[in-house]
Amino acid sequence: MRYNTELFRKHGITTLVTSCPICLKVFREDYALDGIEVLHHSEYMLRLQQAGRLSLRRGATRFAYHDPCELGRGSGIYDAPRAVIEAVGELLEPEHTRENALCCGSSVANTAITDGQQVRIARSVAGELEATGAEVVVTACPLCKKALGRGTATAVRDLAEVVAERLK
């Protein structure tokens, strides 16, 4: 941690953006990063969009959003990903959402369950997301993307991928 902190300071880093909710929590809670703002990429993309620095094309695509455990319940970030999705298409919510969202079976549980159990959990969660009628499942966590991708034939994208596809 000391090495990373010194590296950030040496290079004058004032904002640190991560796509991983677990990394977000670690940088925010375990590092002494006074003067360095730590953001999840959903927060950063929304900030850029609101400042007029990120122009997106809205389409008719229907997106179902999966709340990552560590991003939502762990860090309280629910609205930023949804606002970004709503800028590019229709947001559909599964039955279990926000603080009641189902775990994809990855993350910390990945060390405590078998691969087969993880896939069964992912299929169950993916089934709920598919039931929304969405064309694309969106999440904001690389572990969730990987897990959900193993549980469905529906396209699964990270929020950043969706944004990249919709840049003006």
Identify the residue ranges that each predicted region occupies.
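Iron-sulfur cluster-binding electron-transfer modules in prokaryotic oxidoreductases
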Residues: 1-168
